[in-house]
């Protein structure tokens, strides 16, 4: 019998690896959001509270959007580096960062140097000060909408 894995087995293994990467990506996004107040988006698509298949579908959509594949594995690698940095509360587009990483990968010898270079000005920004807001006459839906807009 042939010891080489069949095309089916290779594809099955690849899909399992993608799903594992998706699970790790969700954990990193949750850690960034809940521990560091860093919101991650993928070309303006919310990533928090998404399941693995939604994350993978968003990556496929992002690849179609920019005309170049956006890999979940690259997104995980960049998100992992963001988690290791001390960044202020922010909203970051990991799709844009992953796309730029592919465009400029010859400039950087690893992902960490890319992320540090791209986010170096983040620490220079003014700190966000919380501000209480009272909304009258909006109702429950209006308050939910206002919360999303802030």
Q: What is the meaning of each model-derived region?
A:
Residues 127-149:
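Glycine-rich adenosine-cofactor-binding loop
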């Amino acid at each position: 019998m042939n010891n080489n894995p069949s095309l089916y087995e290779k594809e099955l293994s690849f899909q399992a690896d993608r799903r594992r990467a998706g699970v790790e990506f969700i954990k990193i996004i949750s850690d960034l959001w809940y521990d560091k107040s860093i919101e991650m988006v993928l070309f303006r698509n919310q990533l928090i509270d998404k399941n693995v298949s939604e994350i993978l579908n968003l990556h496929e959509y992002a690849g179609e959007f920019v005309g170049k594949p956006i890999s979940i594995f690259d997104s995980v690698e960049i998100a992992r580096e963001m988690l290791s940095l001390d960044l202020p509360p922010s909203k970051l587009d990991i799709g844009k960062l992953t796309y730029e990483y592919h465009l400029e990968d010859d400039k950087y010898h690893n992902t960490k140097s890319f992320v540090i270079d791209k986010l170096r000005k983040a620490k220079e920004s003014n700190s966000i000060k919380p501000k209480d807001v009272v909304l009258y006459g909006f109702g429950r839906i209006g308050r939910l909408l206002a919360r999303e807009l802030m």
